[in-house]
């Protein structure tokens, strides 16, 4: 599990405003962390995400050269055990996408 990989996973159970259902997620935590914890920090990818788009928390995958479409929701980080949730690696994003995602994620933790 490496930063920049897209996995397809079941996010349920969820509560309230959390993204739900089976969907792609982007791994944003570094590989050494993922190796030790077996539970990477991920961001959901959605075709909706109106709030994230208008609030500046969405990074579009349009033009990134990925089969996965939609936007990465930088406002919804989660730690998931991908194996326990039946996750499957789909593909990886280019470095430019992960750089933009990390730049939009950073202010949340300041």
What are the functions of these language-model segments?
Residues 1-110:
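Conserved functional hotspots at enzyme active or ligand-binding sites that engage polyanionic ligands
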């Amino acid at each position: 599990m490496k930063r920049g990989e897209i996995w397809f996973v079941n996010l349920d159970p969820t509560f309230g405003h959390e993204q739900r259902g089976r969907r792609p997620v982007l791994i944003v935590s570094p590989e050494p962390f993922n190796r030790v914890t077996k539970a990477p920090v991920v961001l959901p990818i959605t075709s909706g995400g109106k709030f994230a788009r208008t609030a500046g928390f969405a990074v579009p995958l349009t033009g990134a050269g990925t089969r996965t479409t939609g936007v990465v929701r930088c406002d919804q980080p989660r730690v998931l055990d991908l194996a326990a949730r039946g996750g499957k690696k789909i593909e990886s994003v280019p470095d430019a996408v992960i750089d933009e995602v990390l730049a939009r994620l950073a202010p949340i933790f300041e």
